[in-house]
Amino acid sequence: MITTVQEINKWRNLCFIRMQSRKWYPVLKKTPLVADGRKIIKHADKVPHPGEIIHPFYQPTAIEQFTACATEYNPSLLDGKKIAPSLIKHPVSLKTILVDSKLKFDDIRGVNRWLMEFVARRQHQRNIVLTPASKSVRSFHVLHLSSTDIAKLRGLENVLSEIENTNDLQSRVESVNNELQNIFDRDSKQTRLFCEDILAYLIKNYGNSTENLILLINVTEMQLFSRLDQMKAMNIILYHILCKVEANENPPYSPTLVTALENLLAAINNRFFPGRCENSLHPIVIEQLLSYFIITGNLNESKNFLGHLIKKGILPEATIINRYLEAIDVHFDKSTKIFDIRSKFAFIADLAPIIENYGTIDLFKFLIPMCRHFDELCSLLNIIRKSNNAKQAVDSTLPIFIKKVLTFTKDPMINSGNLSTVFNIVSPIYGQNVPSEFVEKFILSFALQGNYTMMAHMIDTYKIKLSHKYQLQIIRALKNSERNHALKNTGAVGYNKEFKKYFIEKYLNCTEREALRP
């Protein structure tokens, strides 16, 4: 039995040597989530197995699947661009690495089988049902201490008071640990006192300062190797510790507190399990740890606990998911660089069932900038269209979708086609009566492409009133179009000089017409 500070420190050092390569959770050492540009290897040109793709919302449409199966030479999805985030095995080291893969096949053979498995996996994600964790914390609050038991703790309470102003943490820990030992020695084998009840009582009543909480966390770690021999007991203690952390401290947390708590977590992991022990943690404690790691900016641990909750069929609170997404954005500084987007996909891969069935407006807003191909954007828009809060979500995200559509290519005809696709997807949500504020945004986007036909069609169909201010916006957009696409599609139907002349004469006032004269 380990009872002294010297013994615990010796044991901890041995554990540290053993755990250097694995820490609290070893898997992430083998699967680095933050992408390393040096690991983008030629092997990524090979089409990955459907199970290696970690994209959480891309679903090829029936037309995309048909086109891929009907193309004899180099059939592809996402135009064969290297934008499918995947976890693949390095061909030499056999380590798992994060890469952007091409979904471009050598020939038509096996494409149908590949698509069937990929679609089946996406369907499985859609069918996952998640339910919120029970918020009953009664089992954590029921401490099995009678008034007689509490009276036996007077000596321990006195020790805590006496050492309050002592700066030497090690001596304070040893004093409390020795008094705990005295209590159990006096009470002999007939004791009704359990170590977890005593520690939970002390944390609840004396852990109101950071210093005391750090002290009690260290005492808990020492007791792991003597009287705390069940994970059920550790669930109770961790619950009270994490409640105090949240109540006592405003982020950022004290580095000393963070170190003490993470040392305790590592010791728990090593004491009861050779690898990962979250399977034995209560869902409420897992949510607490998830919140804690999000606040401390530990994205790897946050991802682990979030993924564990989802695999257990538990739906995390929307506020927790939002904080997790904010932490990702903070870490990557809302970057849209290729490396950063790939890494972001790794951190949200586990969110697929939530995106499919429980998506929130904040989640959808986070995902839109991550789309690197129009087909990804359509997949996301179709998920929103089928969601329970479709109208509210589209109201909040449609302007972002419209803006994003124009970032995939500079070709005005392709952009016009993509804008029309988005409009056709969202129109049924409004019963074909798309609000004029959104129609006006579509018109301005068509103006940026120099598409006079679609502008005229939408103005007439939705009876858009062309105020002086709005006409000036259209003119500015058309001028930008002429600068950006001066040599493109000038003779195409809907874009040529005849359509331009017709649009100017019918829809613009005399004063505005002159601004567009050659």
From Swiss-Prot:
GO cellular component: mitochondrion
InterPro entries for this protein: Aep1
Predominant localisation class: mitochondrion
GO molecular function, one term: translation regulator activity
This protein's UniProt keywords: Mitochondrion, Transit peptide, Translation regulation
Compartment(s) where it occurs, according to its Swiss-Prot or TrEMBL record: Mitochondrion
Transit peptide interval: 1-19
Family: Belongs to the AEP1 family.
Descriptive protein name: ATPase expression protein 1, mitochondrial
Gene responsible for this protein: AEP1
